[in-house]
Design a protein with these regions (language model features):
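N-terminal small-residue-enriched
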Residues: 2-93
Length: 93
């Protein structure tokens, strides 16, 4: 089965949807770094190109993508949730 989302680095705690993912579906992902597989139930619909949470985040917890911190959660985020500008803010500005 082709992956529905990609994880760029083993340290990442979000994946990037390569297809639209429907809420409630078991989404299959693949890590580009080592080829490992991960499956998670999507709690929200995740549009193509957007992020899916691979773990639960507490408010103000850092979010890692590409092996680097890209921002922090502005609210609690459940595993499988849609991760985007509505619940993550860049640490840069």
């Amino acid at each position: 089965m082709k992956p529905q989302f990609l994880v760029h680095d083993k340290k990442d705690d979000v994946g990037v949807a390569v297809v639209d993912i429907t809420a409630g579906e078991k989404a299959a992902g693949s890590c580009l770094e080592d080829g490992s597989k991960v499956t998670i139930e999507a709690k929200d619909s995740i549009p193509l190109g957007h992020k899916i949470a691979l773990k639960a985040f507490k408010k103000d917890e850092n979010v890692t993508k590409y092996g680097v911190i890209i921002g922090h959660a502005t609210q609690a985020i459940t595993a499988g949730a849609h991760v985007h500008v509505h619940n993550v803010k860049s640490n840069r500005w």
